[in-house]
């Protein structure tokens, strides 16, 4: 019996030392959202894409906790689907090969001015989606935190 008690204390000590147990995941999400918001103008396109994808992940984590059918969530879901189909990535990197090689070859024939306009449109779309998501998440996470404190 004493071995069992000793083993349980050792396991409890190991759990405390690893620090992997989070006391409040909403606080963690709020901290991550604040990190995303602390840099309103990302340094490059890759950072903008990464920040938008992280905001999407936070949205997917918190949006499903509401009743279905809210117009705000429906609009954001539609915008996210459009963004994800236009910005296909694997492990955070743009996909390569296959059909995309054919598209890239065809894109070589497109004037640079059109490419620049398309790139600016993609950046503007990503920024708009990022802003919509972060505004939604600020309200959502603050509301969940307030509701949790009331209980």
Swiss-Prot record:
Keyword Secreted in annotation? yes
Indicate the principal place this protein occupies in or around the cell: secreted
Which terms are listed as keywords in the entry? Immunity, Innate immunity, Secreted, Signal
Keyword Repeat part of the UniProt annotation: no
Q: Which domain of life is it from?
A: Eukaryota
For this UniProt entry, what's an example GO CC term? Answer: extracellular space
Disulfide topology: none
Looking at the Swiss-Prot or TrEMBL record, what is one Pfam family this protein matches? Turandot
Give the location in the cell.
Secreted
| UniProt signal peptide | 1-23
BP terms from Gene Ontology: cellular response to heat; innate immune response; response to bacterium; response to heat; response to oxidative stress; response to UV
The family this protein is said to belong to: Belongs to the Turandot family.
Described purpose of this protein according to its UniProt entry: A humoral factor that may play a role in stress tolerance.
Name-wise, this protein is Protein Turandot Z
């Amino acid at each position: 019996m004493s071995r069992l008690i000793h083993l349980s204390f050792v396991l409890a000590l190991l759990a405390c030392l690893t620090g992997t147990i989070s006391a409040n995941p909403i606080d963690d999400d709020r901290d991550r959202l604040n990190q995303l918001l602390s840099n309103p103008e990302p340094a490059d396109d890759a950072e903008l894409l990464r920040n938008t994808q992280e905001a999407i992940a936070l949205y997917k984590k918190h949006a499903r906790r509401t009743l279905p059918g809210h117009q705000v969530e429906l609009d954001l879901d539609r915008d996210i689907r459009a963004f994800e189909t236009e910005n296909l990535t694997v492990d955070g990197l743009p996909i390569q090969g296959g059909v995309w090689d054919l598209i890239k070859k065809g894109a070589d024939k497109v004037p640079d001015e059109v490419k620049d306009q398309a790139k600016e449109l993609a950046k503007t779309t990503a920024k708009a989606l990022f802003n919509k998501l972060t505004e939604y998440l600020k309200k959502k996470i603050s509301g969940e935190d307030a509701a949790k404190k009331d209980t």
